[in-house]
Amino acid sequence: MKLIRTEDAVGQVLCHDITQIIPGVVKDAVFRKGHIVTKEDIPVLLSVGKEHLYVWEKKEGILHEDEAAVILRDLCINDNMTASEPKEGKIEIRAEADGLLKINSEKLRAVNGLGEMMIATIHGNFPVKAGDRLAATRIIPLVIEEEKRNRAKEAAGGEPLLKILPMSHKKVGIVTTGSEVFKGRIQDAFGPAIRAKLAAYDTEVMGQVILDDCQEDISAAILKFVRQGADMVLCTGGMSVDPDDRTPGAIKAAGADIVSYGAPVLPGAMFLLAYLGEIPVLGLPGCVMYAGRTVFDLVLPRVLAGERLTKADLDSYGEGGLCLNCEVCHFPNCGFGKQ
């Protein structure tokens, strides 16, 4: 690549796109990389402010911005994704299928830390739809040393930085406890709220049982749903420290391994996560009945995508785990649950 006066560029090959920007009207290339400059092009180039041009001068070990952008694309792209053609050194990656987006954050930071190149993504651990933008790559200068390309590959490791976990059909059992609901003193509000959340995904509610605050009965109901083929069991009610609340003990008595009782999320601090073998058993706090967004909205898509969550996964929600209860909710396009 060499720099020359625009008036001297006739017959030369452009090594980058020439962009015209008219605010509110257009932002696009008037000439593409690889275009051979003609005499008639000179006034056009000058009209967009190009007094000098970079023209192609191929050197060993040097990559053009579009070549390097393709390399960054290949570090990111995975199954169920598609990428745009390079344009001005930029490439966009989009989802081709619905699922849960996973990002290797540590390796992403390592690649970006090399300088002169960038990969920007949306937040991971959230569901995406086919067609959604996932990431974009760009090289900062017009050319980059091939050696830096090799360092980027090494920093990224052997696996793509992005992954979409599919969400297959899941059968869900709901166990609701509380003497006030069981004895008909109040109407159950958990069931409708949970069904509305589940309806956003490929799920089937096998049934809902309403029980008194009896640990043995709650445990038996959990185990019955599991025997019937439930992929997940949701337990509602009885999650506080009140002496009549027996749900956490019932989940443990059913044989489930408690991952965490409590999460650094508001609303949702009294959330319980357990696994009965491979079956997730979730204890949902009362806020799920009335709050627009809670810890349940953060955990549900990850569980449905087959992730086996750990206490560390829940602990990481502390930063970003406070819902601001905005007058108009824009979740997930907000800070809630962003790690």
Model-found features: residue ranges?
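Short, low-complexity N-terminal leaders and the immediately following helix N-cap/first helix
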Residues: 1-88
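Glycine-rich phosphate/diphosphate-binding loop of Rossmann-like nucleotide-binding domains
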Residues: 158-213, 217
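Extended, charged alpha/beta regions that create polyanion-binding interfaces
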Residues: 59-167
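Residue-level recognition of short, solvent-exposed, well-ordered loop/turn junctions
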Residues: 32, 38, 43, 123, ...
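C-terminal terminal segments
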Residues: 29, 85, 100-118, 126-129, ...
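Flexible, glycine/charged-enriched surface loops at secondary-structure junctions
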Residues: 55-56, 81-86, 144-146, 204-208, ...
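Short glycine/threonine-rich loop/turn motifs
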Residues: 179, 206-337
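Solvent-exposed alpha-helices and their adjacent loops that cap or buttress functional pockets
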Residues: 7-11, 29, 83-86, 126-128, ...
